[in-house]
Amino acid sequence: RSTLFPYTTLFRSHEGIGRTGVVGVLRQGDGTRRLGLRADMDALPIVEATGLGYSSCHGGRMHACGHDGHTAMLLGAARYLAATRRFDGTLVLIFQPAEEGQGGAEAMLADGLLERFPCDALFGMHNMPGLEAGHLGFRAGPMMASQDLLSVTLEGVGGHGSMPHLSVDPLLAASSAVMALQSVVARNVDPQKAAVVTVGALQAGEAANVIPQRAVLRLSLRALDGQVREQVLQRVRQIIELQAASYGCQASIEHYPAYPVLVNSVEETEFARQVGVELAGAEQVAADRLGQRPVVERG
């Protein structure tokens, strides 16, 4: 907001959209087109010790995430557009909070973002560590994977490690489920389509000689197609429930849908690619390399 302040005579600034989102609107000429440029941000739990004038005002929180670089880039674009005004129509600059976790985009949409600021097309960009510095990448169609998070609790009967016959071991059931889940993509998903099932945590017990009462698994699922996503979700649920039952345990599954597949429209993607070629040169546009494989590494 403070960066846009010097240009308030040019930008109409709107704050508090989706709680902390900011939108800047800039008009030029008589054009009727309305294009949106969107950037996001995500603070990290880091103590900022840079001493810079724009350092975080909140202890233990720093805008050091890669997504915060997106906001810095859009602020740079705002200053350039306000200074040069080389366009005809309306530009809507969307500064979205909470790219991950809290779902800032959903909050802004629920707050009437697109009803208040309708756009003919929306453009955004994401830094890509896999691309060489100075290069741009474009891909029409599925670009970034959906993400679903699962928290699984397996309930058994705890007991002493010397008397396993009097217990129902949820850790054994959880271990078996982890191994069985490796078959979901390998034996259920079309090899020409992409999906990932990751068990990122298995938590159970505290003592070497005690069989725990419960075990907890935390999973993330990713897919680049809606049908594949549903297929993976169904098989994961089925495997967990049946593996738990086979060891005499009860399974409860909490599902947290995070994000759908990001799908880039063909026409707008090609338009952006052509602009990239004009600005940076064809040799700097990595359309072929990026186009070979969509991105499943997300958040």
State each model region's role.
Residues 3-10:
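Short, small-residue-biased leader/transition segments that mark boundaries at the very start
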Residues 12-17:
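Short, well-structured beta-strand/strand-turn elements
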Residues 22-23, 43-62, 68-69, 81, ...:
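Histidine/acidic-residue-rich, glycine-tolerant segments that coordinate divalent metal ions
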Residues 175-299:
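Metal-dependent amide/peptide-bond hydrolase catalytic core
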Residues 71-78:
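DPxDG-like acidic metal-binding loop motif
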Residues 24-31:
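Short beta-strand-to-loop junctions in surface cap/lid or active-site-entrance loops
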